[in-house]
């Protein structure tokens, strides 16, 4: 069991020891926002916020501009936001500063380990539209960046907590580590009115692969089984050097494809040029999706199929692997969302080789702005640990999770969470574990 844990940590957390590191000319700006394809006027921030996942920098910043569905409104900050709007309108530039602390507590832990963990992440992000701001422009080009500082509050790290402290083959609060300074995004995004685009640079692949509404570990579910690929994809780390393209094939059908360096290291990103061009170890993916409502709601009302392949990594002794993932999500009555998502992996370094998640969400103020507003989320997952990573004959795991995000103000939210983990695969002593969490977000 200890060997399996160390191997998982090597893949996900010790990327700084990989030769080189980092990647991305990433993926998929995928296609251009539909309104962009229909209008030749100057692009606005909200138009930029329509493609990519909820955690892409433009989408996240746009959600922070929403001023409804809050308990309080701080009037004294209005001049500050008006100043930011003026900068955006005049220069095409805007930014956000966010701080995310998290605390986790488990009902039991393995001998010699702690039963709680806490850390925090500071994030500074922004985008600058340098091309296509004229009224008659037929394309736009935008520079996007996201820099983080990840630091611990306790000896245990939330990102490693589930695996190390109670033998659960998975991650809870996956980005909450102690990497220190950490590059997540630095890429160029080009879009055309015909509905196609590309992104190239250092990107977070999870912004563009298997995108759906409640995917964010910063604002939504804590457990990775309710996020990208339901833990069945062998994903690169942040700041992966790669290239992606995408576009709308029809009014309601889109295609995304890309490849990224598997040896990315967000703490030393520019070494990614060496690993990208020398090691040739890539994560490749193609996704076709059908939007069941309007394009600007594509990650809310969506059915998509993602196929992926990860090359063998010689340095860390991980076999090549491949898999498929199918996702369905649908909103109704403006406030409710339901989802059913599942996939499989053959070999590779994914946590699970089979995984199915079902559940829903409820937002009293309406499902819409990603990661913003009061919101209830709940889900159930069945997962089978990956034999190629952990070894054979492990029990299947079952996960139940529920959270409620309280939007205190536009700048501050708090999200309590509870999880019930059944048959943690790497824990021979316990047949179930309770995990309690508290996460906050402060943003300006």
Predicted regions and their residues:
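N-terminal regions that are enriched for targeting/export leaders
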Residues: 39-108, 112
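Transmembrane beta-barrel strands of outer-membrane/channel proteins
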Residues: 95-103, 143-149, 198-202, 257-261, ...
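Outer-membrane beta-barrel "beta-signal"
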Residues: 432-444
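Detector for outer-membrane/organellar transmembrane beta-barrel domains
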Residues: 290-388, 402
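Outer-membrane beta-barrel architecture
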Residues: 85, 125-127, 187-189, 244, ...
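Surface-exposed coil loops of outer-membrane beta-barrel proteins
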Residues: 156-187, 192-283, 287
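Short loop/turn motifs that connect adjacent beta-strands in outer-membrane beta-barrel proteins
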Residues: 38-40, 72-95, 128-143, 194-195, ...
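Sequence/structural signature of outer-membrane beta-barrel proteins
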Residues: 102-108, 150-154, 207, 226-227, ...
């Amino acid at each position: 069991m200890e060997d399996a844990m160390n191997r998982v940590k090597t893949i996900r957390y010790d990327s700084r020891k990989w030769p080189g590191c980092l990647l991305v000319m990433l993926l998929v700006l995928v296609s251009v926002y539909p309104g962009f394809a229909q209008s030749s006027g100057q692009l606005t921030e909200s138009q930029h916020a329509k493609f990519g996942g909820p955690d892409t920098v433009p989408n996240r910043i746009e959600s922070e501009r929403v001023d409804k569905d809050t308990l309080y409104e701080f009037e004294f900050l209005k001049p500050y936001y008006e100043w930011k709007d003026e900068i955006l309108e005049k220069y095409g530039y805007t930014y956000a500063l966010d701080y995310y602390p998290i605390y986790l507590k488990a009902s039991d832990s393995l001998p010699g380990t702690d039963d709680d963990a806490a850390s925090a992440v500071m994030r500074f992000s922004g985008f600058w539209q340098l091309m296509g701001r004229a009224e008659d422009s037929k394309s736009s080009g935008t520079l996007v960046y996201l820099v983080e500082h990840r630091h611990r509050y306790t000896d245990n790290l939330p990102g490693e907590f589930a695996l190390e402290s109670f033998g659960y083959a998975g991650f809870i609060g996956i980005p909450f580590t102690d990497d220190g300074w950490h590059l997540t995004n630095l890429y160029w995004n080009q879009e055309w009115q015909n509905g196609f685009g590309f992104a190239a640079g250092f990107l977070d692949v999870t912004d563009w692969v298997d995108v759906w509404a409640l995917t964010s570990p910063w604002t939504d579910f804590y457990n990775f089984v309710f996020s990208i690929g339901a833990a069945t994809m062998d994903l690169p780390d942040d700041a992966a050097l790669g290239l992606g393209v995408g576009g709308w094939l029809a009014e309601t059908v889109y295609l995304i494809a890309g490849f990224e360096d598997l040896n990315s290291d967000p703490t030393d990103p520019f070494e990614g040029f060496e690993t990208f061009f020398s090691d040739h170890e890539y994560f490749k993916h193609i996704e076709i999706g059908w939007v069941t409502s309007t394009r600007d709601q594509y990650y809310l009302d969506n059915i998509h199929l993602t196929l992926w392949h990860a090359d063998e990594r010689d340095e860390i002794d991980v076999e090549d692997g491949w898999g498929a993932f199918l996702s369905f999500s649908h909103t109704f009555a403006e406030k409710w969302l339901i989802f059913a998502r599942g996939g499989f992996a053959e070999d590779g370094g994914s946590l699970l080789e089979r995984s199915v998640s079902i559940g829903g969400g409820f937002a009293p103020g309406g499902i819409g702005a990603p990661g913003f507003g009061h919101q209830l989320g709940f889900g159930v997952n069945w997962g089978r640990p990956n034999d190629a990573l952990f070894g054979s004959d492990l029990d299947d795991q079952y996960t139940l999770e529920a959270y409620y995000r309280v939007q205190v103000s536009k700048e501050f939210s708090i999200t309590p969470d509870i999880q019930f983990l059944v048959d943690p695969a790497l824990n021979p002593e316990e047949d179930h574990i309770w995990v309690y969490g508290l996460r906050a977000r402060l943003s300006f």
